[in-house]
Amino acid sequence: MIKILIRAGITLVFCVLGAFVFAFFSPRPPLTIDPETLAGDGSSINYCELPELNGNGRFAKDIPKGNTPGCAYDHFPLPVLRDCTEPLPDGASDIRGLWIGTSGHIGHLERVEQCGARVVVTSSGIIHDAGPNSTGGLNSNDTEGGVLFTIGDKEYCPRTSASVTWNKGVLDFHVFGWGPLVVNRYPDGEELIWEYADGSTTRMERLCELPAEYKKPKPRGKRISFFPS
């Protein structure tokens, strides 16, 4: 019995260590976001004027996947799908826009883009993009954004990956595409509801303009420093 417990303990340690190494030290996904999108100023847009999804322009599959440079962008970028006009699929709710939390995670701000079956969420320094695109992979393949530690000048934040599927008007996010459900988003009247993996439920209201204090993301994470330069 003792040997079994020891073996189980050793196996658990190696599993945790392997997950940690994968999350923090595996190669970062290549930066595939359009450089003009990343360099542009997302604070200059009226987010109450939503693009018309009439199918007369580009489709989701024609646009490169958006993702986060390093552990966070340095300013709020332009919308990834600003030139996309593909209609939403059957069963999808229209939750596009700029939203801010009024209960739960009060002050949380995010931009939700949709075009066809594709969804992009930009918030707190990160860009999560899932669905058809021109550079590969339906799941988001990105970082969580919170910097756990630094080695010298290099920041280390955990990798994340999730799929998005519509379930009776509710947008479900599953870890790696096959894992557990970790996030939901869905409309409730004029509000957007965000149910997160920590068990919280955040109600958000629509904004037309990005508040000035959200243009540059605040540093996140413990930022434990090793071998500072």
Question: What is each of the regions a protein language model found here?
Answer:
Residues 59, 105-159:
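N-terminal glycine/threonine-rich, aromatic-flanked beta-hairpin/loop signature
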Residues 157-189:
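Acidic, glycine-rich flexible loop segments
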Residues 191-199:
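Short, exposed beta-strand-loop hairpins at the edges of beta-sheets
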